[in-house]
């Protein structure tokens, strides 16, 4: 499994549109929704700089991501002009392999006697 990570700096006036497009059921996820190997995308907004976002796509492997991009090229090309208008900068952080995942168990409430 791989995670493809990008950061975006979005103009204030387009933050809502960006969030809708990259959020659940948005244009970005719809590009890949039926693609083999696509597990989903996560949209994060920086708590200190609300114009800065991180998008994390989760895929089975690089080959399936590349194939999905090729298969969705027309839709991507249609989406690109809007994206370019909304963003001030974009940086690809890269493709990462998940090595480990840690979680915190929920605390149990003390039982009443």
Which residues are covered by each model-predicted region?
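Active-site-flanking beta-strand signature of metal-NTP-handling nucleotidyl enzymes
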Residues: 2-9, 54
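N-terminal presequence-like segments and adjacent domain-start helices
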Residues: 8-11, 15-16
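An amphipathic, aromatic/His-enriched active-site/gating alpha helix that lines ligand/cofactor pockets
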Residues: 17, 23-39, 58-94
């Amino acid at each position: 499994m791989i995670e493809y990570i990008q950061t975006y700096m979005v103009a204030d006036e387009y933050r809502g549109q960006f969030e809708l497009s990259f959020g659940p059921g948005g244009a970005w996820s719809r590009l890949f929704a039926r693609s083999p190997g696509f597990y989903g995308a996560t949209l994060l907004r920086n708590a200190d700089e609300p114009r800065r976002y991180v998008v994390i796509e989760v895929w089975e492997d690089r080959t399936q991501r590349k194939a999905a991009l090729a298969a969705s090229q027309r839709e991507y090309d249609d989406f690109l002009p809007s994206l370019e208008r909304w963003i001030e900068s974009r940086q690809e952080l890269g493709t990462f392999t998940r090595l480990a995942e840690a979680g915190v168990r929920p605390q149990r409430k003390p039982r009443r006697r």
